[in-house]
Regions:
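Hydrophobic alpha-helical transmembrane segments of multi-pass inner-membrane transport and secretion
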Residues: 1-17
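Basic-flanked hydrophobic alpha-helices used for secretion and membrane insertion
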Residues: 10, 17-168
């Protein structure tokens, strides 16, 4: 019993350092951001370049994200957060399929979609506001792959100001 207790305690003691190391390697490999600046008015390319030119900034990129309603395979409306794909920061890890090659293609979160979603359509709902729909060049996107993002390392995908209030 003592040996079992010692083994259990040793396992618990080393687990933290192993988990921290694993998370550190994962986040470094995918270039997870250190700081995220958000503006309802947006940033200009000059703003992003000014940040990138700072001596202690390794990489800075502008990105766009928007919460929208889409229709799932059962025609139910769900909330999804769409992100532009960046090259230097918050790199995506491809799990299945391939990265988009054209503007009407997208990849989706492997925690929310299965491999069956590849080559299917992600259709934006007509119940989105006109302002939200105007943010997109297309109303329908072909899913080309499943990815993991360092922005979502937990089960929850966040809250939304539309739909049922949950990104799912």
């Amino acid at each position: 019993i003592i040996a079992l207790g010692v083994a259990f305690f040793s396992g618990l003691k080393i687990t933290q350092s192993v988990m921290v190391h694993s998370a550190d390697v994962y986040l470094k490999d995918l270039q997870f951001y250190d700081y995220r600046l958000v503006s309802t008015l947006g940033f200009t390319e000059e703003n992003v370049e000014a940040l990138a030119d700072k001596e202690d900034v390794r990489a800075a990129e502008g990105a766009i994200s928007a919460e929208v309603l889409y229709k799932d395979a059962g025609e139910n409306e769900r909330v999804i957060k769409m992100h532009s794909i960046t090259e230097k920061v918050n790199k995506l890890k491809l799990i299945a399929g391939e990265m988009p090659q054209s503007a009407d293609e997208c990849v989706v979160d492997s925690a929310l979609f299965s491999g069956d979603a590849i080559r299917s359509k992600l259709v934006l709902s007509e119940n989105n506001t006109a302002d939200d729909l105007d943010k997109f060049a297309y109303k329908e996107y072909t899913i080309t792959g499943l990815v993991q993002s360092p922005c979502y390392i937990q089960f929850e995908r966040g809250n939304a100001s539309i739909g049922n209030g949950r990104i799912s």
